[in-house]
């Protein structure tokens, strides 16, 4: 069994059936609110892509995608997506979206190398979204303005859930707090990245950490990011303090995407310049793709957070080892 935290005297606030109803209500409300706040149109999304397209998300560069061949197109190496970070940018181009317009998808993925715990599963479900901006809008103000719009959706969703289930108490602060990963390291130099996240979230409740992927003054990274979608200076993670765990929980990762210059720079730093030859990267370097901002928002994470669940398996059906299943059942954690 991987790391599993059991909250003391945990009792779910909703029954299994109530939970299933609440999941649907919550997802519908959040999705509608997000689309309205960011001017997004829902589009259909692929479950798998061809490896040779360069469209799959390489995450931290070491995770193995689920792959298979197919009878009809034997020359293709098909991969289950990790996320749609690069696919969305291409879709905005293909579907002829305009400045200020965006898309979102219901993204389902399998991350076979994920370490299982209370908030991590091999099954990933998230709203993947992407929006067109001008080159001049590739700045921190655009990033912060978008984060505030997304946070307003979180706030409205909490209000909605509390109105439906009054025994669930509000915990989100009125406003989101911004801090850079370097400021965070300077503030807590003796803590690990994850410990810093919890420390700052315990203080402010809801925090957006700016600048993830590049090295800090210490020579360490706050966290890893693939070099070919986020600009490491204009991205970040949205985290909330979760009292049930007494820890910070990441609900969303997002950022302004790489332009031609930052793509080349980050590919060089990451020592994977060979990706320049892939179709997606060629289109980007030739200026054929729009400048964008985008991200992913975890659906199960949101349901877990707002319904005050102790395990992500209480809001999604996935695969768990027998020890984890037994321990959860012994502690009122009812996995779907």
Swiss-Prot record:
InterPro entries: aa-tRNA-synth_II (IPR006195), aa-tRNA-synth_II/BPL/LPL (IPR045864), AsnA (IPR004618)
Keywords of this entry: Amino-acid biosynthesis, Asparagine biosynthesis, ATP-binding, Cytoplasm, Ligase, Nucleotide-binding
Any GO molecular function: ATP binding
Domain of life of the organism encoding this protein: Bacteria
GO biological process, one term: L-asparagine biosynthetic process
Coiled coil stretches, renumbered: none
Gene3D superfamilies in the cross-refs: Bira Bifunctional Protein, Domain 2
EC nos: 6.3.1.1
Gene Ontology cellular component annotations, sorted alphabetically: cytosol
Localization per Swiss-Prot or TrEMBL: Cytoplasm
Pathway: Amino-acid biosynthesis; L-asparagine biosynthesis; L-asparagine from L-aspartate (ammonia route): step 1/1
Enzyme class: ligase
A Pfam family annotated for this UniProt entry: AsnA
Reactions listed under catalytic activity: L-aspartate + NH4(+) + ATP = L-asparagine + AMP + diphosphate + H(+)
Database matches in CDD domains: AsnA (cd00645)
Homology family: Belongs to the class-II aminoacyl-tRNA synthetase family. AsnA subfamily.
Family annotation (NCBIfam families): asnA
Protein name: Aspartate--ammonia ligase
């Amino acid at each position: 069994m991987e790391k599993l935290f059991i909250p003391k005297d945990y009792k779910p606030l909703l029954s299994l059936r109530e939970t299933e109803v609440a999941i649907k209500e919550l997802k519908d409300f959040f999705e509608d609110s997000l689309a309205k706040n960011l001017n997004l149109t829902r589009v259909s999304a692929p479950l798998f892509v061809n490896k040779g397209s360069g469209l799959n998300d390489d995450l931290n560069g070491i995770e193995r995608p689920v792959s298979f061949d197919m009878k009809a197109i034997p020359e293709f190496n098909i991969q289950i997506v990790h996320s749609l970070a690069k696919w969305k940018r291409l879709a905005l181009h293909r579907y002829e979206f305009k400045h200020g317009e965006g898309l979102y998808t219901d993204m389902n993925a399998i991350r076979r190398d994920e370490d299982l715990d209370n908030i991590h599963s091999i099954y990933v479900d998230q709203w993947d979204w992407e929006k067109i901006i001008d080159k001049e809008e590739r700045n921190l103000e655009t990033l912060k303005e978008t984060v505030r719009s997304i946070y307003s959706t979180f706030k409205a969703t909490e209000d909605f859930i509390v109105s439906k289930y009054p025994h669930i108490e509000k915990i989100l602060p009125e406003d989101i707090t911004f801090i850079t990963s370097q400021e965070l390291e300077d503030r807590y130099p003796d803590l690990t990245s994850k410990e810093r996240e919890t420390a700052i979230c315990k203080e402010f409740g809801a925090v957006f950490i700016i600048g993830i992927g590049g090295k800090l003054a210490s020579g360490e990274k706050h966290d890893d990011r693939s070099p070919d979608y986020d600009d490491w200076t204009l991205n970040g993670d949205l985290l909330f303090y979760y009292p049930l765990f007494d820890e910070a929980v990441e609900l969303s990762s997002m950022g302004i995407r790489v332009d031609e210059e930052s793509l080349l720079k980050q590919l060089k730093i990451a020592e994977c310049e060979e990706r320049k030859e892939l179709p997606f990267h060629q289109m980007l370097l030739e200026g054929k793709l729009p400048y964008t901002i985008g991200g992913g928002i975890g659906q199960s994470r949101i349901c877990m957070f707002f319904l005050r669940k102790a395990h992500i398996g209480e809001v999604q059906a996935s695969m768990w080892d027998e020890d984890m299943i037994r321990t959860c059942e012994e502690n009122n954690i009812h996995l779907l």
